[in-house]
């Protein structure tokens, strides 16, 4: 299911001329993390990236995952044209009515003993999430 989710967003991004580079190395047994939770996390990350790349001269998305020592790490770097940040440094949705993507990603990471970090710098939005598998 995770691969199908990634392929869906990869195709969507490529249709808009975005360069996409996705390498996911996720083991069959991901411990206590459900397939649906992982699909939501990967899907939200990629959906945000595809949306952020609109209006960028050279749009790109690069996603990687790695599993080591019982920890799954997923990183995603993408170009962006516009971000909205709150005074506390957290990010606000650019979507009409607001979005929950980053909050859902962070909540899933915390639920599984992990964490998340999001940063926008010099036209690149960096997302990194880690989850404990056991």
Annotate each language-model stretch with its function.
Residues 113-123:
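Glycine-rich ATP-binding loops of the HATPase_c
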Residues 19-41:
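Conserved short strand/loop->alpha-helix "switch" segment adjacent to the catalytic nucleotide/phosphoryl-transfer site
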Residues 35-58, 107-108:
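Conserved ATP-binding N-box helix of the HATPase_c
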Residues 104-114:
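Conserved glycine-/histidine-rich ATP-lid loop and adjacent helix of the Bergerat-fold HATPase_c
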Residues 1-16:
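Short beta-to-alpha transition helix within the HATPase_c
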Residues 82, 121-128:
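Glycine-rich nucleotide-binding loop
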Residues 70-103:
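Glycine-rich/acidic phosphate-handling loop/turn and adjacent ATP-lid/helix
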Residues 56, 60-70:
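Short beta-strand/loop element within the Bergerat-fold HATPase_c
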């Amino acid at each position: 299911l995770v691969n199908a989710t990634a392929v869906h967003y990869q195709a969507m991004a490529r249709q808009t001329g975005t360069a996409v580079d996705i390498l996911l190395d996720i083991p069959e047994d991901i411990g206590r993390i459900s397939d649906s939770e992982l699909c939501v996390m990967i899907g939200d990350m990629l959906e945000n990236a595809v949306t952020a790349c609109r209006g960028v001269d050279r749009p790109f998305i690069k996603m990687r995952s790695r599993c080591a020592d019982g920890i799954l790490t997923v990183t995603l770097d993408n170009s962006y044209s516009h971000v909205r940040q709150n005074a506390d440094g957290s990010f606000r949705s650019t979507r009409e009515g607001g979005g929950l993507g980053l909050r859902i990603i962070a909540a899933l990471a915390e639920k599984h003993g992990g964490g998340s970090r999001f940063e926008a710098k010099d036209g690149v939005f960096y997302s990194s999430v880690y989850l404990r598998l056991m």
